[in-house]
């Protein structure tokens, strides 16, 4: 087949992604740092080869870098083409590199030798990142569900989502439940870069004329940092804060965390030891060693409750709507939250 070099703008590329597989031809290290969700890595160069070509470019110029790149890539061309043939759908592929330049163009030519019709991402992954960060800074109708640790916010949002409410699960995307204990039982966290890619995809499926609910989070969720632009949007959105007593929250926290080994709980407590103070940290550690989880949880909640109340006090006047509840029933509390949302100005 004749080789035709076709480059698409980001919007068109992402629209075609719904039906056409994406081959990311950057190095494995670049891909691991962040990639278009669903893209498959078929690298032109591995990480060491990419570094070598970059060094040749700096020292000897473009032509010698191209020649060295051909030397390095040529032995693996058949394997790259086989992977592309396995990935292609209906003889078509979407292909991108970092800037939409030589790497994606070279791989598109290679794939054409196997009869694959490739469309390239104009501007590459760099253009995609600029696009999504601009979109994440776009004004949306966010409503933040806040509440004290253990008040069941995640369960409430899931209940609301099952009823057709638009919800973005930030903790799910970040693989972390948002406290010193948040990594327990979770998959490895994505990079902050890839989290933003996942977040963009999630929000892209939602309607602009309906509110989007988010759980109240600080700028970082574990090791993941939200984009500054998105975090600032969250900080100015209305907050509905669910307030309940420690005794009401305690059964849920016991159910969630006592399934983990005591040493893992202990390690999580030590992460906040400076904030708890030496005496309270020792008391929590002693309680854990004795299997007295309720006491350990109460001690940690003293810190988290104080910190959360302080955070709410920093919000703008009238930004926070408080709901007091005496039950941990998810359906009941979801109804209370939705009623409060209807009364927002």
Segment roles from a protein language model:
Residues 143-162:
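Glycine-rich phosphate-binding P-loop
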Residues 67-122:
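Catalytic cysteine-centered active loop of the rhodanese-like fold, especially the PTP/DSP P-loop
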Residues 234-239, 243-345:
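Conserved NTP phosphate-binding and transfer environment spanning the P-loop NTPase/kinase superfamily
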Residues 163-232:
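Conserved nucleotide-sensing/catalytic segment adjacent to the nucleotide-binding pocket
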Residues 1-37, 65, 133-137, 142-148:
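Flexible, polar/low-complexity N-terminal or interdomain linker segments that lie immediately upstream
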Residues 16-88:
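Positively charged, proline/Ser/Thr-rich regional signature most characteristic
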Residues 117-133, 254, 265-268, 272:
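Long, charge-dense
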């Amino acid at each position: 087949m004749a080789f035709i070099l076709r480059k698409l703008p980001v919007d068109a590329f992402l629209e075609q992604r719904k039906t056409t597989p994406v081959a990311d031809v950057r190095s494995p290290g670049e891909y691991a740092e962040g990639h278009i969700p669903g893209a498959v890595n078929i690298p032109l160069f591995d990480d060491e080869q990419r570094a070598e070509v970059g060094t040749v470019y700096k020292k000897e110029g473009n032509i010698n870098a191209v020649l060295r790149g051909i030397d390095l890539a040529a032995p693996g061309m058949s394997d790259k083409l086989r992977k592309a043939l396995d990935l292609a759908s209906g003889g078509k592929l979407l292909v991108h590199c970092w800037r939409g330049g030589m790497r994606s163009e070279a791989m598109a030519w290679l794939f054409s030798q196997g009869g694959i019709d490739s469309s390239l991402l104009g501007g590459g992954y760099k253009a995609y990142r600029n696009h999504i960060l601009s979109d994440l800074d776009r004004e949306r109708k966010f409503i933040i569900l806040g509440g004290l640790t253990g008040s069941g916010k995640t369960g409430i949002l899931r209940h609301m989502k099952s009823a057709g409410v638009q919800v973005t699960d930030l903790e799910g995307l970040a693989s972390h439940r948002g406290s010193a204990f948040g990594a327990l039982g979770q998959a490895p966290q994505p990079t902050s870069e890839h989290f933003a890619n996942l977040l963009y995809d999630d929000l892209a499926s939602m309607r602009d004329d309906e509110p989007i609910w988010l759980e109240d989070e600080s700028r970082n969720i574990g090791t993941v940092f939200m984009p500054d632009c998105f975090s600032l949007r969250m900080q100015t959105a209305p907050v509905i804060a669910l307030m309940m007593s420690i005794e009401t929250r305690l059964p849920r926290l016991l159910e969630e965390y006592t399934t983990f080994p005591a040493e893992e709980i202990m390690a999580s407590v030590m992460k906040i030891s400076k904030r708890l103070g030496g005496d309270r940290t020792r008391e929590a550690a002693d309680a854990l060693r004795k299997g007295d989880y309720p006491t350990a949880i109460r001690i940690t909640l003293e810190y988290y409750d104080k910190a959360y109340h302080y955070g709410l006090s920093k919000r703008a006047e009238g930004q926070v709507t408080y709901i007091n509840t005496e039950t941990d029933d998810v359906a009941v509390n979801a109804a209370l939250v939705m009623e409060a949302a209807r009364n927002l100005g």
